[in-house]
């Protein structure tokens, strides 16, 4: 049990004490992350507002930035936020979608003259012309905590104002 507890602290999952004992004899480990032990797609599990931003403001901004996002991650953000922060949603036809691309690593919408975006930390910071060293310490800590636990942090902004962080993670199957 003590060995399993130490592994959990390092984000390693062991299903039995025998597995922990056998791991002592392992010299090479090859992992196949295709959904064997997880559902295989990252899901939104939390949002963390920036200092001075309410959870409602972040939730609405992240929801709008995700409404036109057809990816599994985008759909999970919408699903999560519809429960957490219900709001009157605009008709998707009134949104101008900005699709995710590997080059920009951003997505979002333009709606009623406002620019809603979410994306990878470095990409979103470049989009709003903010250096990583100028990022609020509270957001830096949250981004690092999410990444350290194996999650994916996404920053959210509206009209260049950082609203906070979305926590995406691959959920382990029961």
List PLM regions with ranges:
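N-terminal sensory regulatory modules of PAS/LOV and PAS-like folds
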Residues: 42-43, 77, 121
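Long, highly charged amphipathic alpha-helices
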Residues: 57-61, 76, 138-141
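Conserved catalytic phosphorylation-site environment of P-type ATPases
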Residues: 1-67, 86
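Signature of the cytosolic headpiece of P-type E1-E2 ATPases
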Residues: 73, 81-174
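General structural feature for long, well-ordered alpha-helical segments within catalytic domains
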Residues: 22-25, 73, 77
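Short glycine/threonine-rich catalytic loop with a Thr-x-Gly-x-Asp
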Residues: 67-73
């Amino acid at each position: 049990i003590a060995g399993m507890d130490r592994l959990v602290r390092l984000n390693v999952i062991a299903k039995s004490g025998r597995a922990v004992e056998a791991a002592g004899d392992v010299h090479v480990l090859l992992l196949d992350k295709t959904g064997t032990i997880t559902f295989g797609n990252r899901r939104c599990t939390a949002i963390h507002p920036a200092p001075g931003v309410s959870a409602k403001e972040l939730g609405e901004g992240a929801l709008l930035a995700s409404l036109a996002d057809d990816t599994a991650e985008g759909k999970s953000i919408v699903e999560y936020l519809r429960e957490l922060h219900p709001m009157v949603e605009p008709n998707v036809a009134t949104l101008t979608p900005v699709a995710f691309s590997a080059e920009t690593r951003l997505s979002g919408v333009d709606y009623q003259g406002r620019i809603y975006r979410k994306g990878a930390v470095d990409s979103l910071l470049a989009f709003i012309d903010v250096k990583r060293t100028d990022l609020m310490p509270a957001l830096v800590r949250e981004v690092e905590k999410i990444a350290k636990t194996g999650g994916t942090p996404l920053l959210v902004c509206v009209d260049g104002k950082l609203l906070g962080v979305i926590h995406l993670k691959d959920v382990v199957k029961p």
